[in-house]
């Protein structure tokens, strides 16, 4: 099993099929809520070295996403009453008529309404990007193996990304996560948030590099709501060059 903290309120636990089998569980056990399922979730939590803010919280909700070779469980420390758990699934009605896909969609919607919505959306965005990367890689390998599919295209030399932050503190925290080379960065102030532009050199990089880097960036930021052109014309320019480097020098209390 693997655990990753996505935000202050959300963990992602990846459980392999072997892990499920060792614990006497199957995917079908998650289709209908039962005491066995909830006990399984909490036994997994007991095995893992949880962050301090999750220990003895008692107010947890679980979102289950089945994959081909694993089970992804998103654990959210909710601000709502700790009694909100799998019993809430009663509101779904007659689940015997639901397909597994319908059930998981209903479960996801319920957790969205009661949990860390932004974290869930960001996770889904990252997962979509990485799935696209895998598909693109396989497609490129297929084209490389078949000369008849090769065609000339003009590769991009640089890519601009725009990221959003609710506060300047979030922007500083993001800057401190940057441990790779960037060509340029700018910081703007909008009407209700901060915007940062990041310029990356993608020359001599594989075609999926831009997507991979974007996925890394939005792990600690929100996808941009404005274009760089819009910010240059309408945004308040705070740092026009080296924004990341300047923010990295700021000490957070």
UniProtKB/Swiss-Prot annotation:
GO molecular function, one term: protein-macromolecule adaptor activity
Recorded domain comment: The N-terminal domain probably binds unfolded/aggregated proteins; the C-terminal domain interacts with ClpC.
Similarity section: Belongs to the MecA family.
Assembly behavior: Homodimer.
Function: Enables the recognition and targeting of unfolded and aggregated proteins to the ClpC protease or to other proteins involved in proteolysis.
Protein name: Adapter protein MecA
Source organism of the structure: Streptococcus pyogenes serotype M1
